[in-house]
Amino acid sequence: SIIADGNDITYLPDYKRASILGRVFQDPMMGTNPNMMIEENMALAMRRGQRRGLKWGISQKEREFYHEQLKLLKLGLEDRLTTKVGLLSGGQRQALTLLMATLKKPKVLLLDEHTAALDPKTAEKVLDMSDRVVEENHLTTLMVTHNMKDAIAHGNRLIMMDAGHIVVDISGEDKKKLTVPDLMALFSKASGSTEANDKMLLG
């Protein structure tokens, strides 16, 4: 079963889960509509899980709110509200998707290898933004990654899986003291495997 905030959401339809879960996908192109403006994408995110009727799409008050939220990303997007999202870089789109996923303060935020398609410098920026957004909004977050270095550096609990089973579960001070070689050794011992590919080591 999948339990969120005390409720079983295992079989909830996607439109109902949308008000509970925020998601950022691996592909920067998946979380936004490239043919719509930044403010229009944000408006859709704000209305996630709500009944929609016929009214003006974006009020001035909303526009001011989006401006302030975008300013927190420190990417200059607050002055590009009417820019079509398709004109943004992959890193900008992923940062926007992260912001959109957290506008409604979801019960759980899912980050599905959300930096895997980005260059190392941009990936680091998006990870830093993720940490800041999660901390400021006190969000329960699950980040999926094959990068051991990132798994150690981010979050307060680290879980490794092998063949669908949890084989490593470490948190607190033990996690803070971890190194990549330590983690490789733990995984090898728990899974019985001596293989660790480059993706796990470097991302």
Tell where the protein language model's regions lie, with residue ranges:
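Helical segment within the ABC ATPase nucleotide-binding domain
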Residues: 124-136
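H-loop/switch region of ABC-family ATPase nucleotide-binding domains
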Residues: 145-146
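Catalytic Walker B motif of ABC-type/P-loop ATPase nucleotide-binding domains
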Residues: 109-112
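Conserved ABC transporter NBD signature motif
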Residues: 1-7, 170
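Q-loop/switch helix immediately C-terminal to the Walker
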Residues: 36-48
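ABC ATPase C-loop
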Residues: 101-102
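ABC ATPase NBD coupling module
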Residues: 8-22, 52-59, 176-181
